[in-house]
Curated annotation (Swiss-Prot):
NCBIfam families: DPOR_BchB. The active site is at D299. Pathway: Porphyrin-containing compound metabolism; chlorophyll biosynthesis (light-independent). Its cofactor is [4Fe-4S] cluster. Belongs to the ChlB/BchB/BchZ family. This is Light-independent protochlorophyllide reductase subunit B. Gene3D superfamilies: 1.20.89.20, Nitrogenase molybdenum iron protein domain, Proto-chlorophyllide reductase 57 kD subunit B. Component of the dark-operative protochlorophyllide reductase (DPOR) that uses Mg-ATP and reduced ferredoxin to reduce ring D of protochlorophyllide (Pchlide) to form chlorophyllide a (Chlide). This reaction is light-independent. The NB-protein (ChlN-ChlB) is the catalytic component of the complex. It comes from Marchantia polymorpha (Common liverwort).
Length: 513
């Protein structure tokens, strides 16, 4: 457990609730004190949905602490069973209520006896995993539960569909542009002549999970959620899975070639033919997607060699790093992720595309790294957007966690060929172009009386006299912050507290030496 005013990945119960509320006709009971029950408000605010969030808080109060939780939890489960008639009720504690060390599995067993719905306890260690790991585990638990139930009831149908088909695993509520990505993936698979068997958990019914093994393969677009489910299905039913994220021209082509390889295992036997997707890749890359053309244009060449910093979840940070370095010629000075549990995979993906790698879930480390590198643009989460505003560095948001402006009403996928256009726009518009800042200052676009200091520290031990301040204001805006910082660094090294014009020139000479 960690006390912080900003966390990249939330507590474990949020991940469980995100998965439960993504399914249709599934209700979640959260055994929690007041204060932990903010999920309903958060989801209602951020997701563009008309349905109520199917989550009920079973509040731990003084009466519960005095008498125990069993009666209240069981009553809440049976009440929701009668009111909502869900297919499944998921009970989850929070990290706070886990301190009580109650036998919640016993509560679930008791409630199951008087409920028509299936009732399960989310099998998650709330002290060891974060939101994303818990979501991955909960999805796998629900899929396993219903496939084992179907096996016991002899309802499991293992015969493949007549035409090539896929399950898309890992699209769920509050995901970064997940709804748009889902539409783009459906369009991509449709273009390839592949049917969608199931999409889980978003919009799926748990009663249909027994049909998952009918698909020819599973597609897992995000590493954070869905990989455990895909591994389980591979182990139990021999279902192949593809976990290459189709983001960026290169990885989309790789993903489609992997799909072709999987489809061609069965198509000669069941359909009497083989598929060739190379003409589709060629047409989309050259004529449909604008990104490949844009990367060769003079506009994109203006970005060559510019420095960028990337930070986000493992999937998006790795993909954006490769797009910037390989497809747009932008130098990635540092790339990082807050998914510490996926560090090995992340390092393997990005090691040849950036100068340094940062694995941390501490936003202050990220802020200090950005202040040190002084990139031309940042590509990160909502927190990097805040850091960018403080440092006067533009930021494009490419990963969760995000706020309301990154749940757009318009169509904004990051995956697929349309996603390449969106990413190219985002990257190009995030950089300050040419002499834009300087021209704005010349023509009075900005108030130039005060100098913007790019620093996250709150040190106030240095003072600038009026002459040095005037000299600093004469320097063009796009290099002024750097000169100010270098001068202050020189002053501290030489124990100078008052900065004059002479100190500025001495700092310049020292730097040039």
């Amino acid at each position: 457990m960690k006390l912080a005013y900003w966390m990249y990945a939330g507590p474990a119960h949020i991940g469980t609730l995100r998965v439960a509320s993504s399914f249709k006709n599934v209700h979640a009971i959260m055994h929690a004190p007041l204060g932990d029950d903010y999920f309903n408000v958060m989801r209602s605010m951020l997701e563009r949905e008309r349905d109520f969030t199917p989550v009920t808080a079973s509040i731990v109060d003084r009466h519960v602490l005095a008498r125990g939780s069993q009666e209240k939890v069981v009553d809440n489960i049976t009440k929701k069973d009668k009111q909502e008639h869900p297919d499944l009720i998921v009970l989850t504690p929070t990290c706070t209520s886990s301190i009580l060390q109650e036998d919640l599995q016993n509560f679930v067993n008791r409630a199951s006896m008087s409920s028509d719905s299936d009732v399960i306890l989310a099998d998650v260690n709330h002290y060891r995993v974060n939101e994303l790991q818990a979501a991955d585990r909960t999805l796998e638990q629900v899929v396993r539960y219903y496939l084992e139930k179907a096996h016991r009831q002899e309802k499991l149908n293992l015969s493949l569909t007549d035409k090539p088909s896929a399950n898309i695993i890992g699209i769920f509520t509050l995901g970064f542009h997940n709804q748009h990505d889902c539409r783009e993936l459906k369009r991509l698979l449709q273009d390839l002549g592949i049917m969608i068997n199931q999409i889980i958990p978003e919009g799926g019914f748990v009663e249909n999970l027994h049909e998952l093994p009918k698909a020819w393969f599973n597609l897992v677009p995000y590493r954070e959620v869905g990989l455990m489910t895909a591994l389980y299905l591979e182990k139990e039913f021999g279902m192949p899975y593809i976990s290459t994220t189709p983001m960026g021209i290169v990885d989309i082509a790789n993903c489609i070639r992997q799909i072709q390889k999987q489809v061609n295992i069965w198509s000669p036997i069941l359909l009497g033919k083989k598929f060739d997707f190379e003409p589709y890749i060629d047409e989309q890359t050259r004529f449909i997607s604008q990104a490949a053309w844009f990367s060769r244009s003079i506009d994109c060449q203006n970005l060559t060699g510019k420095k960028a910093v990337v930070f986000g979840d493992a999937t998006h940070a790795a993909s954006i790093t490769k797009i910037l370095a390989c497809e747009m010629g932008i130098r990635v000075s540092c790339t990082g992720t807050y998914c510490k549990h996926d560090e090995e995979w992340f390092r393997e993906q990005v090691q040849n595309f950036c100068d340094e790698i940062l694995i941390t879930d501490d936003h202050t480390e990220v802020g200090d790294m950005i202040a040190r590198i002084e990139p031309s643009a940042i590509f990160g989460t909502q927190m990097e957007r805040h850091i960018g505003k403080r440092l006067d560095i533009p930021c494009g948001v490419i990963s969760s966690p995000v706020h309301i402006q990154n749940f757009p009403l318009g169509y904004r996928p990051f995956l697929g060929y349309e996603g390449t256009n969106q990413i190219a726009d985002l990257v190009y518009n995030s950089f300050t172009l040419g002499m834009e800042d300087h021209l704005l200052e010349i023509f009075g676009g900005h108030d130039t009386k005060e100098v913007i200091t790019k620093s996250l520290s709150t040190d106030t031990d240095l003072t600038w006299n009026s002459e040095s301040q005037l000299e600093l204001n004469k320097i063009p805006g796009f290099v002024r912050g750097k000169i100010k910082r270098n001068t202050e660094k020189f002053a501290r090294q030489n124990n100078i507290t008052k900065i004059t014009v002479e100190v500025m020139y001495a700092a310049k000479e020292d730097l040039s030496a």
